[in-house]
Amino acid sequence: MVKVGVNGFGRIGRLVTRAAFNSGKVDIVAINDPFIDLNYMVYMFQYDSTHGKFHGTVKAENGKLVINGKPITIFQERDPANIKWGDAGAEYVVESTGVFTTMEKAGAHLKGGAKRVIISAPSADAPMFVMGVNHEKYDNSLKIVSNASCTTNCLAPLAKVIHDHFGIVEGLMTTVHAITATQKTVDGPSGKLWRDGRGAAQNIIPASTGAAKAVGKVIPELNGKLTGMAFRVPTPNVSVVDLTCRLEKAAKYDDIKKVVKQASEGPLKGILGYTEDQVVSCDFNSDTHSSTFDAGAGIALNDHFVKLISWYDNEFGYSNRVVDLMAHMASKE
């Protein structure tokens, strides 16, 4: 089992760690975070307002974080080049600070003995992989990769199924997205993106997202055919993608439901879900799928123009894919 270090013990860092312990697919051996001391790590890992208390044991012992009896080395380095991943036995590093998202910046981890880096965010220049969509294109000459964004992980599997069966001529995506850490609790300064600085709990905030364009990077045939935007809404977790697209081949809405359901039970099982239930966002909290197609929510204007709806736990589904990508990469060593 591949040994993993986590850089940045925020929402994604902690939930990747949870997902690793839940699934047993990778072995977490080290964590670096300069802003959280060991005792605080114990507390933050144990208690989670969104996903509930960790079902297991967490304690600090001999300067290490001990989860379910397993000791994890703790570093508190600000500069990624100074983290001694090699000494801790970490072969792969999850870069989940949200800061070091380029090849150059994430590459600093290699100096400390890591063999590969997985950026848990979209990257301007690192190759992006979405499980179930283009993970087979990974080859082990790549030292630094990106797991794309939570929204790309929701949209891409659905877009792939639709494009493979009916062909997407063009499409627009909207994600109605839960609050994340980059937002402000009350109105505050936000650099160039003034709207993003408005109170997160009080507003529906139109925002940009590169998620739809990024689908063109993981599904090259869709390059230039999709774009999109986001509305940030006052919910703590779980988001939903609305893909409105023009189809090449005529398709009844029932035909679309059928192929998505087949994919969810076959090649994309565990990644793309399917439901005909009368669900709402809360029903997907702590759901491990990248995307769950809501058959009852979508609509067709005609046989060539449809609106498709898919839910995702933007924290936990994504964190589980980070683990899956690392396990896939390890299988290619």
Curated annotation (Swiss-Prot):
An individual GO BP term: glycolytic process
GO cellular component, one term: cytoplasm
PTM annotation, UniProt: ISGylated.
N6,N6-dimethyllysine modification, residue list: K3, K64, K192, K213, K225, K258, K261, K332
Modified residues (S-nitrosocysteine): C150, C245
Residue positions of the active site: C150
Keyword Phosphoprotein among UniProt keywords: yes
Modified residues (Phosphothreonine): T73, T151, T175, T180, T182, T209, T227, T235
Keywords assigned: Acetylation, ADP-ribosylation, Apoptosis, Cytoplasm, Cytoskeleton, Glycolysis, Immunity, Innate immunity, Isopeptide bond, Methylation, NAD, Nucleus, Oxidoreductase, Phosphoprotein, S-nitrosylation, Transferase, Translation regulation, Ubl conjugation
Listed EC numbers: 1.2.1.12, 2.6.99.-
CDD domains the UniProt entry points to: GAPDH_I_C (cd18126), GAPDH_I_N (cd05214)
Entry annotated with the keyword Oxidoreductase: yes
Modification ADP-ribosylcysteine occurs at: C150
Gene3D superfamilies: Dihydrodipicolinate Reductase, domain 2 (3.30.360.10), NAD(P)-binding Rossmann-like Domain (3.40.50.720)
Family: Belongs to the glyceraldehyde-3-phosphate dehydrogenase family.
Subunit structure: Homotetramer. Interacts with TPPP; the interaction is direct. Interacts (when S-nitrosylated) with SIAH1; leading to nuclear translocation. Interacts with RILPL1/GOSPEL, leading to prevent the interaction between GAPDH and SIAH1 and prevent nuclear translocation. Interacts with CHP1; the interaction increases the binding of CHP1 with microtubules. Associates with microtubules. Interacts with EIF1AD, USP25, PRKCI and WARS1. Interacts with phosphorylated RPL13A; inhibited by oxidatively-modified low-densitity lipoprotein (LDL(ox)). Component of the GAIT complex.
UniProt remark on domains: The [IL]-x-C-x-x-[DE] motif is a proposed target motif for cysteine S-nitrosylation mediated by the iNOS-S100A8/A9 transnitrosylase complex.
Protein name: Glyceraldehyde-3-phosphate dehydrogenase
Gene: GAPDH
